[in-house]
Amino acid sequence: MATTTRRSDLDGLSALVTGGSRGLGLLLCARLARRGCRVTMAARDADELRRGAAWVEERTGATVSTTVCDVRDRAAVGAMVEQADNRQGGLDVVIANAGVIQIAPVASIDSRAFEDAMSTVFGGTVNTAMAALPPLHRSDVGGRLCLIGSVGGLLAVPHLLPYSCAKAAVGTLGEGLRAETAGKNVSVTTVHPGLMRTGSHLQAEFGGRASKEFAWFSALAGAPVVSMDAERAAERILRALERRRTRLVLTPAARAASVTHGVAPATVTRLSGLAARLLPNPPDGNGEGPAEGGMVQGHDIDRPAHTVTEKVRGWGSALNDRAARRYNQHLPGPPTSG
């Protein structure tokens, strides 16, 4: 019996992805390119963009455009969107994915951590969405705007408070834009992923007892039971865009946490407090951080584990380290193509 390939509603459209040079954004660019989309990949780092574009082109055979842009800069974002709109003959899909993540107890950070998270995660999303809406309204097929939030925006996660606050704002923005663009040729989809194996632990910023914060986060983010394969996550997101869904919460753990928080928020807050007691205590002094995950003292993703503790922790972090190599997160060198 002959088999047929299901045509996607996204096939051949024009797309722009911010934070597209690595991790989830890189995979979204690749899957859009595989669908025959004209893709612009945007990020702050020119070298990362070059490597990311080469990775996508090697895997898909498609050519992607790149734009260096800091999403915190409103004028630069406007120019980026205008350039993609002109170059690609319009815009049909825009995915606001750029962001930063800080991991530290609140006692080890100050207001600047919140300002940084809000300016990049929320401010960058606002800049992208507001610049993208006019060309999306003009789309012949109806524009699709996707905002990447987080389960951390649906409930506060211990040691990720600035990130949670910023992602909560992204979630509210998505709901508001969905309501105000209803019936106006644009659909807005907000995605709230749980933990994903993207290798992002190497790009996150760690404070307090940085090496211990890095250890728990990298292991948990790579654990198969609670984290999601990044390729699968990217495909789920694009399917949600195809169907013009309002909201998507990824991973069973994230969905369970979100539902429980909606029904019994006080109980979830108490459980979060218990979880916080299991995490590293703030240092007495200034601590080790802040430092990017790839620069945390003692971390070497190619170093074998020797102690039992290292082996147990490595069960999760090894998968995340593998994802880091694959998805352009590994700081010392280029990604693999596997």
Residue ranges and their predicted role:
Residues 14, 19-22:
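Conserved glycine-rich cofactor-binding loop
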Residues 35-51:
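Conserved glycine-rich Rossmann-like NAD(P)H-binding loop of the short-chain dehydrogenase/reductase
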Residues 46, 68-79, 111:
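The beta1-alpha1 cofactor-binding region of Rossmann-like NAD(H)/NADP(H)-dependent oxidoreductases
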Residues 105-106, 110-115:
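Substrate-binding pocket helix/loop in short-chain dehydrogenase/reductase
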Residues 129, 166-169:
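Active-site helix of classical SDR
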Residues 150:
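Residue(s) in the substrate-gating loop at a strand-loop-helix junction
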Residues 183-255, 259-282:
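SDR active-site lid
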